[in-house]
Amino acid sequence: KLVEINISEKEVIVDPREAQKKNQLIFPPRTFFLGDTESAWKKCAHVFKGQAHSNGQEHLYIETQGAYAVPLENGHIRISSSTQGPTAVQRTAAKVLNVGMHKIEVDVVRIGGGFGGKEDQATPWAIMAALGTQILNKPVKVILSRLDDMRMTGKRHPYSSDYKIGFSKELKIMAYETIFYQNAGAAADLSPAVMERTLFHGTNSYFIPNVKMTAYSCKTNLPPNTAFRGFGGPQGMF
């Protein structure tokens, strides 16, 4: 009764193509190119166009996200976290708790399976535990249930792509263009790095003399997607 909440419904965007049309981007688009695709199309005997779509993927690590924070002397805090990036936990905890990094100790006894899902995504739960410890001066543990973990954490990035590919009479690839629409979710997380890896892997194992690839990291109303084995490479090669 002491808190009054006013909620206004806003448009929900979950399709990266729709987000791109409305300029809802995590950061500016990137384009990689080689040769001259515009000139190459005229020399191609066969040209194909189409779309490709790849969905997200749950990490399903053996143990869910979790952290345990304990108060030490002189305002120091020790965080036991299932993170793949202990320095990120230390740096973020110091910023949120407004203390020096030297006052935050991060231990990683075991991860319990990660596959990329406990890089940046492990940090919020560790910070919640640390903040509770700072306020209460008592040990605090935060462990997600499997259902909450699957609902609240990011997955492999879904992609939607437009492609155009041209072949010579001998069926050698002469030119290739593609536009990637990455579904980043609501915040950046590792989406910029994942997107650039997609561009680096866009031609798979082939040498194509004329290439142009553009990628958009699209902001949608979903949990921020994150690293997963391959880190954007599989989406680019697909």
Per-range role (PLM):
Residues 1-238:
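Structural alpha/beta core scaffold segments of enzyme domains
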